[in-house]
């Protein structure tokens, strides 16, 4: 079959809720993927940061295969031998009393919202049905009805109403706006991305997260960090919140928690918060399944043992430095932290970020635009300096043709 045949079949039988680049991939290894015709590409999207450990990392795949042959699912109706090991390992890894295992990022966000509201009623003493959670404009936390109810992006929420109440929307990177919102006595939580990924890798001012964290604690409001995309080494530290020395009251993780091998997400909190939910009040058939547990342990061990946070920091500095040296009128701004980066483009002669990504594909590197004019560059954290310089050369040469 030709690439267009695969695409035609997918479009015929699949819902049209994505607009992929016209490339059909068959195999991946490390920082590379190969299409059905055998052409190799640098993967500079990494499954929206889920593939931080690289494609098909041998240690993670080995863990997957060993567990798949032993036991894959029991549901939480019974105990599994590996689940307690996973919970202990990850709680100690990130420094929390408890975790609640889920599968997807959106599920984890929903779980955190429920947990925050429950804490607000049971611990803070907010009147029934009055709890409010503060969120930021231009956020992206998922696609469920409740999550899009706090979105400010029409492509996420338009014509999907009625919407879930209970959210206060404020501008991102604005401490004064948060201070004003927290005057509401019914405010129980502040949900924030340490860096807004889908918005175009928007990095807040230094000190913003710390100031927000301090405000939350002054007002007895939970600080909830959505580190699904920024966490697990992506920004050059284990968590992006580590840059400001803050420990979220509720931490949400996903994506790279499994190294892109299986859907695994988790919500972390201490006992005072987590134990407000009792048996039967929240759950997931697949959440914490043995396969996911084994894979997640291996994925985190890879991050630790291969020093991927440190490599992300070093390679990110290299990438941004080289990008800023490119003299091209289409490059308006380079921003990011670690290996979560973006190039903000300026249209030229009718050419946009989409056209640049098509040209990058032809030259052996795949990346994807966000918001039409921004290209997100997020390679696997295992990338070497030699590989990074080769990829930068592709990007430089591609821009030179525009």
Regions found by a protein language model. Name each.
Residues 1-402:
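Conserved N-terminal phosphate-binding loop of PLP-dependent enzymes in the Aspartate aminotransferase
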């Amino acid at each position: 079959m030709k690439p267009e045949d695969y695409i035609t079949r997918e479009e015929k039988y699949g819902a049209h809720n994505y607009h992929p680049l016209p490339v059909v991939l068959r195999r991946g290894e490390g920082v590379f993927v190969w299409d059905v015709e055998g052409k190799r590409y640098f993967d500079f999207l990494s499954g929206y940061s889920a593939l931080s450990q690289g494609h098909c990392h041998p240690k993670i795949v080995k863990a997957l295969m060993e567990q798949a042959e032993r036991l894959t699912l029991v549901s939480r109706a019974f105990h599994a031998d590996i689940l307690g090991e996973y919970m202990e390992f990850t709680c100690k890894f990130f420094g929390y009393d408890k975790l609640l295992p889920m599968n997807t990022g959106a599920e984890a966000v929903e779980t955190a919202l429920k947990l925050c509201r429950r804490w607000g009623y049971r611990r803070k003493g907010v009147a029934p049905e009055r709890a409010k959670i503060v969120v930021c404009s231009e956020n992206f936390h998922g696609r469920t009805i409740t999550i899009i109810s706090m979105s400010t992006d029409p492509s996420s929420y338009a014509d999907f109403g009625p919407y879930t109440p209970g959210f206060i929307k404020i501008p991102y990177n604005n401490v004064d706006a948060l201070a004003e919102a927290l005057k509401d006595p019914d405010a129980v939580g502040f949900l924030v991305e340490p860096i807004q990924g889908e918005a175009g890798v928007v990095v807040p001012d230094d000190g913003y997260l710390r100031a927000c964290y301090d405000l939350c604690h002054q007002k007895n409001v939970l600080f909830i960090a959505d580190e699904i995309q920024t966490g697990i080494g992506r920004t050059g530290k284990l968590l992006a919140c580590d840059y400001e020395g803050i420990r979220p009251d509720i931490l949400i993780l996903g994506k790279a928690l499994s190294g892109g091998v299986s859907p695994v997400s988790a919500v972390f909190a201490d006992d005072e918060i987590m134990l407000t939910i009792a048996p039967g009040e929240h759950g997931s058939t697949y959440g914490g399944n043995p396969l996911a547990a084994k894979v997640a342990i291996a994925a985190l061990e890879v991050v630790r043992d291969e020093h991927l946070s440190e490599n992300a920091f070093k390679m990110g500095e290299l990438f941004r430095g080289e990008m800023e040296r490119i003299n091209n009128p289409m490059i308006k701004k380079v921003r990011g932290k670690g290996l979560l980066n973006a190039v903000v483009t300026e249209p030229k002669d009718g050419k946009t970020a989409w056209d640049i990504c098509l040209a990058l594909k032809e030259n052996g590197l795949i990346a994807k635009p966000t918001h039409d004019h921004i290209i997100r560059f997020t390679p696997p954290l295992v990338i070497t300096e030699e590989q990074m310089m080769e990829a930068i050369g592709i990007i430089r040469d591609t821009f030179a043709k525009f």
